Amino acid sequence: MYRNVLVWPNQKLRAENEKIENVEDVQDLIKDLIDTCNVKMGAGLAAPQIGVNKTIVVIKPSVFGKENPDPSEYNPDYMVIVNPELNNQGEEIKWKEGCLSLPDIDAHVVRSETTLLKYTSEKGEEKRLIAEWPFSGGIQHECDHLLGKLFIHRMDKKKAAFLLDRWRRKKRKARIKAKRALKAARR
Protein backbone atom coordinates (compact mmCIF):
# COMPACT_ATOMS: atom_id res chain seq x y z
CA MET A 1 0.00 0.00 0.00
CA TYR A 2 1.27 3.44 -0.93
CA ARG A 3 2.14 5.75 1.98
CA ASN A 4 3.00 9.42 1.94
CA VAL A 5 6.70 10.23 2.03
CA LEU A 6 7.69 12.58 4.85
CA VAL A 7 9.45 15.76 3.79
CA TRP A 8 12.19 17.56 5.69
CA PRO A 9 12.04 19.10 8.33
CA ASN A 10 9.63 16.46 9.70
CA GLN A 11 11.19 15.31 12.98
CA LYS A 12 10.44 11.62 12.33
CA LEU A 13 13.22 11.77 9.74
CA ARG A 14 15.72 12.62 12.50
CA ALA A 15 14.36 10.29 15.21
CA GLU A 16 16.07 7.21 16.58
CA ASN A 17 15.08 3.99 14.84
CA GLU A 18 14.29 0.61 16.38
CA LYS A 19 16.01 -2.59 15.33
CA ILE A 20 13.68 -5.23 13.96
CA GLU A 21 13.55 -8.37 16.09
CA ASN A 22 11.39 -10.52 13.81
CA VAL A 23 11.11 -9.95 10.05
CA GLU A 24 7.72 -11.68 10.01
CA ASP A 25 6.39 -8.64 11.89
CA VAL A 26 7.38 -6.25 9.08
CA GLN A 27 6.18 -8.04 5.93
CA ASP A 28 3.38 -5.49 5.39
CA LEU A 29 5.88 -2.67 5.94
CA ILE A 30 8.16 -4.20 3.28
CA LYS A 31 5.28 -4.19 0.79
CA ASP A 32 4.40 -0.59 1.70
CA LEU A 33 8.01 0.53 1.23
CA ILE A 34 8.25 -1.15 -2.18
CA ASP A 35 4.84 0.12 -3.32
CA THR A 36 5.66 3.67 -2.21
CA CYS A 37 9.11 3.59 -3.81
CA ASN A 38 7.55 2.37 -7.07
CA VAL A 39 4.89 5.10 -7.10
CA LYS A 40 7.48 7.80 -6.32
CA MET A 41 9.93 6.28 -8.84
CA GLY A 42 12.70 6.29 -6.25
CA ALA A 43 15.96 4.37 -6.24
CA GLY A 44 15.31 3.34 -2.66
CA LEU A 45 13.35 4.17 0.46
CA ALA A 46 13.88 3.87 4.21
CA ALA A 47 11.13 3.19 6.74
CA PRO A 48 11.59 6.57 8.54
CA GLN A 49 10.69 8.28 5.26
CA ILE A 50 7.16 6.89 5.55
CA GLY A 51 6.94 7.65 9.27
CA VAL A 52 7.97 4.23 10.63
CA ASN A 53 11.04 4.43 12.84
CA LYS A 54 12.40 0.94 12.15
CA THR A 55 15.77 -0.09 10.68
CA ILE A 56 14.72 -1.28 7.24
CA VAL A 57 15.31 -0.01 3.71
CA VAL A 58 14.45 -1.14 0.21
CA ILE A 59 16.64 -0.40 -2.78
CA LYS A 60 16.43 -1.00 -6.51
CA PRO A 61 19.90 -2.18 -7.67
CA SER A 62 19.05 -1.81 -11.38
CA VAL A 63 18.93 1.99 -10.94
CA PHE A 64 22.65 1.74 -10.18
CA GLY A 65 23.32 -0.61 -13.09
CA LYS A 66 23.63 -3.66 -10.84
CA GLU A 67 21.97 -7.05 -10.91
CA ASN A 68 19.91 -7.66 -7.77
CA PRO A 69 21.95 -9.85 -5.39
CA ASP A 70 18.97 -10.62 -3.12
CA PRO A 71 15.59 -10.13 -4.91
CA SER A 72 12.50 -9.53 -2.78
CA GLU A 73 9.77 -12.17 -3.01
CA TYR A 74 7.18 -9.38 -3.17
CA ASN A 75 8.89 -7.55 -6.05
CA PRO A 76 12.15 -8.98 -7.43
CA ASP A 77 13.26 -5.54 -8.67
CA TYR A 78 13.93 -4.61 -5.04
CA MET A 79 16.34 -5.72 -2.36
CA VAL A 80 15.18 -5.57 1.27
CA ILE A 81 17.81 -4.66 3.88
CA VAL A 82 16.87 -5.14 7.54
CA ASN A 83 19.09 -4.02 10.47
CA PRO A 84 22.04 -3.05 8.25
CA GLU A 85 25.60 -2.69 9.47
CA LEU A 86 27.90 -0.86 7.07
CA ASN A 87 31.65 -0.76 6.82
CA ASN A 88 32.55 1.79 4.16
CA GLN A 89 35.92 1.41 2.48
CA GLY A 90 37.95 2.50 -0.50
CA GLU A 91 38.28 5.86 -2.15
CA GLU A 92 35.86 8.67 -1.47
CA ILE A 93 33.77 9.61 -4.47
CA LYS A 94 31.87 12.87 -4.94
CA TRP A 95 28.55 12.44 -6.70
CA LYS A 96 25.18 14.12 -7.02
CA GLU A 97 22.31 12.87 -4.87
CA GLY A 98 18.64 13.67 -4.49
CA CYS A 99 16.09 12.41 -1.99
CA LEU A 100 12.35 11.80 -1.90
CA SER A 101 12.29 13.57 1.50
CA LEU A 102 13.93 16.66 -0.03
CA PRO A 103 12.06 16.93 -3.33
CA ASP A 104 13.51 19.12 -6.07
CA ILE A 105 16.95 19.35 -4.44
CA ASP A 106 20.12 17.64 -5.48
CA ALA A 107 23.70 18.28 -4.48
CA HIS A 108 27.13 16.72 -4.47
CA VAL A 109 28.13 14.63 -1.46
CA VAL A 110 31.04 12.32 -0.74
CA ARG A 111 30.51 8.57 -0.39
CA SER A 112 32.81 5.58 -0.07
CA GLU A 113 33.56 3.53 -3.16
CA THR A 114 32.93 0.17 -1.47
CA THR A 115 30.52 -0.91 1.26
CA LEU A 116 30.74 -4.12 3.23
CA LEU A 117 27.13 -4.72 4.21
CA LYS A 118 25.89 -7.10 6.89
CA TYR A 119 22.10 -7.33 7.09
CA THR A 120 19.06 -9.52 7.61
CA SER A 121 17.03 -10.46 4.55
CA GLU A 122 13.23 -10.30 4.35
CA LYS A 123 13.30 -14.07 5.03
CA GLY A 124 15.21 -13.57 8.28
CA GLU A 125 18.55 -14.82 6.92
CA GLU A 126 21.80 -13.16 8.01
CA LYS A 127 23.63 -12.00 4.88
CA ARG A 128 26.82 -10.25 3.83
CA LEU A 129 27.44 -8.32 0.65
CA ILE A 130 30.29 -6.33 -0.85
CA ALA A 131 28.68 -3.47 -2.77
CA GLU A 132 30.76 -1.60 -5.34
CA TRP A 133 30.24 1.87 -6.76
CA PRO A 134 27.64 3.28 -7.55
CA PHE A 135 25.39 0.73 -5.78
CA SER A 136 27.42 1.28 -2.60
CA GLY A 137 26.52 4.99 -2.72
CA GLY A 138 22.82 4.17 -2.92
CA ILE A 139 23.07 1.80 0.04
CA GLN A 140 24.93 4.41 2.08
CA HIS A 141 22.31 7.04 1.23
CA GLU A 142 19.36 4.85 2.28
CA CYS A 143 21.08 3.60 5.44
CA ASP A 144 21.88 7.19 6.46
CA HIS A 145 18.12 7.64 6.92
CA LEU A 146 18.27 4.98 9.65
CA LEU A 147 20.80 7.19 11.46
CA GLY A 148 18.55 10.24 11.16
CA LYS A 149 20.65 11.77 8.38
CA LEU A 150 19.72 13.13 4.99
CA PHE A 151 22.26 13.86 2.28
CA ILE A 152 22.34 17.53 3.33
CA HIS A 153 23.90 16.39 6.62
CA ARG A 154 26.87 15.08 4.58
CA MET A 155 27.50 18.54 3.12
CA ASP A 156 29.35 21.60 4.32
CA LYS A 157 26.97 23.39 6.74
CA LYS A 158 27.05 26.70 4.86
CA LYS A 159 26.32 25.02 1.52
CA ALA A 160 23.49 22.99 3.08
CA ALA A 161 21.99 26.12 4.70
CA PHE A 162 22.14 27.99 1.37
CA LEU A 163 20.54 25.08 -0.48
CA LEU A 164 17.75 24.68 2.10
CA ASP A 165 17.05 28.41 2.15
CA ARG A 166 16.73 28.45 -1.65
CA TRP A 167 14.48 25.36 -1.46
CA ARG A 168 12.19 27.00 1.15
CA ARG A 169 11.84 30.15 -0.97
CA LYS A 170 10.99 28.05 -4.03
CA LYS A 171 8.34 26.14 -2.05
CA ARG A 172 6.88 29.39 -0.70
CA LYS A 173 6.62 30.84 -4.23
CA ALA A 174 4.92 27.66 -5.46
CA ARG A 175 2.35 27.86 -2.60
CA ILE A 176 1.60 31.51 -3.39
CA LYS A 177 1.20 30.69 -7.09
CA ALA A 178 -1.13 27.77 -6.26
CA LYS A 179 -3.27 29.98 -3.99
CA ARG A 180 -3.57 32.60 -6.72
CA ALA A 181 -4.56 29.96 -9.27
CA LEU A 182 -7.17 28.54 -6.89
CA LYS A 183 -8.55 32.01 -6.21
CA ALA A 184 -8.75 32.75 -9.94
CA ALA A 185 -10.49 29.42 -10.60
CA ARG A 186 -13.17 30.24 -8.01
CA ARG A 187 -14.12 33.51 -9.74
Regions of interest found by a model, annotated:
Residues 1-187:
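Positively charged
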